[in-house]
Swiss-Prot record:
It is an enzyme of class 1 (oxidoreductase). Its EC number is 1.1.1.37. The gene is mdh. One of its GO terms (molecular function) is L-malate dehydrogenase (NAD+) activity. This is Malate dehydrogenase. Substrate binds at R81, R87, N119, R153.
Length: 310
């Protein structure tokens, strides 16, 4: 099993790489790529951790080598959000980075499962898909926007609010991965119930949790540690799927005849990536209105990504 992390020297990339070094199955390879000159040092640093995962670092001119024979590629590369910026402000900076990296994947490991972390995910996932389409190697089952951060935040916030064991909390989150496009389905959380007031307060807290971190770090960064944990969790779901286990997780994927061209759904994962896109079930009146209200924004975000590649 070979996992490549593109953007491994950044805040998310380092946290993610650490968790993969300690969490991937024995015998796995962890390939770290970044344009930052520190990346070989990150690889050396991680290599001192005694686990049976081999680590190698690759600099700016070695993208193809970093990606060769990768089974899974995770992309946290790009510019992080700063105070006053929203995810849309990142598009102009990060769209070009994502395009270049996707072209590298097409050249070196077109059959890999590709997990996209780089914001704005609503628009960067379509860019990757369009690069694959242009090359004639697109497989919708193998391209994912990683929305796990919305799920783990929801789990943490619900457990905190209700005073329950976080290990027992499961919160479905659908839609997109920024602002109001993030839709936690609190009506489907088992074992707890919420008042209308709690739903009205908790939903925007989940949607704006990234801003909460950006502001709390006072210009010193964005959500790197929690995002690293979220991406590692999703990567382990992909690994289990590749190993033949039956895994259901949430991801932003291409959907046919769905709410939008791309939408976060529960998905059954397996050896081909997405084996099945599952229904997100019944929505409450609040959730139905929230979904209908945000679809225009989500579709605009998607169009921006597609148009960038036109």
């Amino acid at each position: 099993m070979k996992v490549a992390v593109l953007g491994a020297a950044g805040g998310i990339g380092q946290a993610l790489s650490l968790l993969l070094k300690t969490g991937l199955p024995a015998g796995s390879e962890l390939s770290l790529y970044d344009v930052a000159p520190v990346v070989p040092g990150v690889a050396v640093d991680l290599s001192h951790i005694p686990t049976a995962v081999k680590v190698a670092g690759f600099g700016a001119d070695a993208l193809n080598e970093a990606l060769k024979d990768a089974d899974i590629v995770l992309i946290p590369a790009g510019m992080p959000r700063k105070p006053g910026m929203d995810r849309a402000d990142l598009f102009n900076v990060n769209a070009g980075i994502i395009k270049t990296l996707a072209e590298g994947i097409v050249a070196s490991c077109p059959k890999a499962l590709v997990g996209i972390i780089t914001n704005p995910v609503n628009g960067t996932v379509p860019i990757v898909a369009e690069v694959f389409k242009k090359a004639g190697t697109y497989d919708a089952k193998r391209v994912f926007g990683i929305t796990t951060l919305d799920v783990i935040r929801s789990e943490a916030f619900v457990a905190e609010l209700k005073g329950v064991d976080v290990a027992t909390v499961k919160v479905p989150v659908i839609g997109g991965h920024s602002g109001t496009t993030i839709l936690p389905l609190l009506s489907q959380v088992e074992g707890v119930s919420f008042t209308d007031e709690e739903v009205a307060a908790l939903t925007p807290r989940i949607q704006n949790a990234g801003t909460e971190v950006v502001n709390a770090k006072a210009g010193g960064g964005s959500a790197t540690l929690s995002m690293g944990a979220a991406a590692a969790r999703f990567c382990m779901s992909l690994v289990k799927g590749l190993q033949g286990e039956d895994v259901v997780d949430y991801a932003y994927v291409a959907v046919e005849n769905g709410d939008a061209e791309y939408f976060a759904h529960p998905v059954r994962l397996g050896k081909n990536g997405v084996e099945e896109i599952l229904s997100y079930g019944e929505l409450s009146a609040f959730e139905t209105k929230a979904k209908n209200d945000m679809l225009e924004t989500l579709k605009k975000d998607i169009k921006e990504g597609v148009d960038f590649m036109a």
